[in-house]
Amino acid sequence: MNEIKKAALHTIDAHANTFTAISDAIWDEPELSLKEFKAAALYTDALEKLGFTVQKNLCGIETAFSGSYGSGRPVIGILGEFDALSGLSQQSGAAEVQSVTPGGNGHGCGHNLLGA
């Protein structure tokens, strides 16, 4: 395994609890596209605590942001969606339909995980 991959895996493992907590919080409070204010705040706060420089309100979109860390190479870009969909409210860990709020918002495509 090369050194970059080892470093990436070490960093992911070191922050796994943070990533899981963010994912769970976003699952628990699903917000529709362009209205993910709580989720965006969770992400930007976490990035800032990890030493990233965060730009908020990208392109006039209140929930869009970017985080930069370090300089030089490699340059890595990641797009993470974190919006919910209407009508997909679901209890965590349930294999069959068990809505938290019937007809409410929920994460059916893993967007709570993609952003984290």
Question: Language-model segments: which ranges?
Answer:
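DPxDG-like acidic metal-binding loop motif
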Residues: 115-116
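Acidic/His- and Gly-rich active-site-bordering loop/insert found
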Residues: 2-107, 112
